[in-house]
Amino acid sequence: MPAASALLSDAHPHSVRVRGVSYTYESEGGPKRVLDNVDLTLGRGEFIVLTGHSGAGKTTLLTLIGAIRSLQDGAINVLGQELGGRDTAAQEEVRRKVGFIFQDHNLFAALTVFRTLWLATGLIENPPSREVALAEARSLLAQLGIEQHLHSRPRQMSTGQKQRVAVARALINAPQLILGDEPTASLDQQSSQLVIGLIRRHLAATGASALIVTHDDRIFGMADRVLRLRDGRLLGDA
């Protein structure tokens, strides 16, 4: 599935290193610290599930690692790029190599599934031809059990089917890191297994890594590690 250029080199044995990261939001009641001196290492090929109660800081940590949110305190290295300060080039480089899967799929209503996936391939440095993108789209959708929707629009699909399209969109560029925020929340058991199975095959084939934020205990047993955030602090295996 992935191109040879997507394979990780031995130069970066860890996909993610988080050291001493803290994050504080300003609220009406005063500053609220949601991350408190968090350390985390995500190894190449590793699949980690991150769980914890709502407001524990899980999504904040995910968006910091994905260079969506700017770092306040501590250090984060993602795929060899140091995040922090005003180095927007490093942030852009990370975002190009990450596949994001969010609970809110945000599909364009006017685009077919294939158009959505083909549009996503334009975000990388060397986008594939239409023919190559079409073949990859067919393969991903078949593995997710929705190949019949290649030329469908979102209004023609169920919520779970649209979520699986979002998974395909995240994987079509063979990302070196997958970050997911409740990616299986709208899926039944069978669909969840299809999604996690596809992610695991991608990790095995490329050496990529995955960090998935979820309350879905159905997938805990499919992860290499299950970590818990509580009151901004990262605890051991849940």
Stretch-by-stretch model annotation:
Residues 111-120:
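Short coil-to-helix segment of the ABC ATPase nucleotide-binding domain corresponding to the Q-loop/switch region
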Residues 153-157, 161:
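Conserved ABC ATPase signature
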Residues 174:
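Conserved catalytic motifs of ABC-family nucleotide-binding domains
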Residues 74-85:
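Conserved ABC transporter NBD signature motif
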Residues 66:
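Helix-to-loop junction immediately C-terminal to a conserved catalytic motif
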Residues 178-181:
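Catalytic Walker B motif of ABC-type/P-loop ATPase nucleotide-binding domains
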Residues 32, 83-99:
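ABC ATPase NBD coupling module
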